[in-house]
């Protein structure tokens, strides 16, 4: 018992000095309120899935392509890789691409295939304004940025859309709703992971959705608050630079700066530097297995912010005696990229805990 108390003390000490070093308070909004507020913010009318899928069988995998509806006019294109075995149902991992990517990227397809080799069904979807969600196919992140610009320009708060992360998070909840209706899915064994934007959408979606049992964040853990307050917002801003430039111009500025970035985030991803920031929301994932994969020189998700998020998670996991279910790995001297070593660790994490 004494060793357990000692371990908890050192955890709190680690949390305190991590946040102190990076200048961030640990006075987070209570977890239950975060979950309720985020769910309320994203809530919208439910519609029937009206799913349609086509199946192709090879020697090594069954591939399903199709879609479901998450909203009245929102098709969610899906790609499903299923093991070719005698099993009738499988654990599932939903895996998400980054900004400008799609479910059909070679790297995403390889992850789905590697999951099937471990007896896991792999599911990928196109985020809003990506991939097949644009007629004829998206042009990298061009349509995504255009949708964000349109949302920024909206003057009617009652009809404010949130294409920057939040709307895709809602889609992920509906994809999970759909998956648990399938007879070939083990509903109590669903995992979720993603790279960059997809990883951000993962910690947002999985934090409040307890049906997601295992989580992996690849170059996605961060603190928007820390980035904003420490002049480290440029990498994240540059992923949709045109949208930020327009917002800056609308506010009378000739260049993107801290204040117009704060206003931009405040309208399009409200709460992102407070209760919906990663260090706050990541606590809600405990005690479920969580793997955080970061890189030392990540300009989009700066490492100091990722360490603040990890420290926050560590406190929550220790309070629930689940510290063995939390792990962080940092790839040295690497920029904002998913490394082969981290992808292997991700696959092993899902195999171990799912």
Q: In which residue ranges do the predicted regions lie?
A:
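Short beta-strand/loop motif that positions the catalytic acidic residue
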Residues: 292-294
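Cap/lid segment of the alpha/beta-hydrolase catalytic domain
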Residues: 99-170, 226-231
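Primarily recognizes the serine-hydrolase "nucleophile elbow" in alpha/beta-hydrolase
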Residues: 173-242, 271-273
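Acidic catalytic loop of the alpha/beta-hydrolase fold
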Residues: 297-301, 335-337
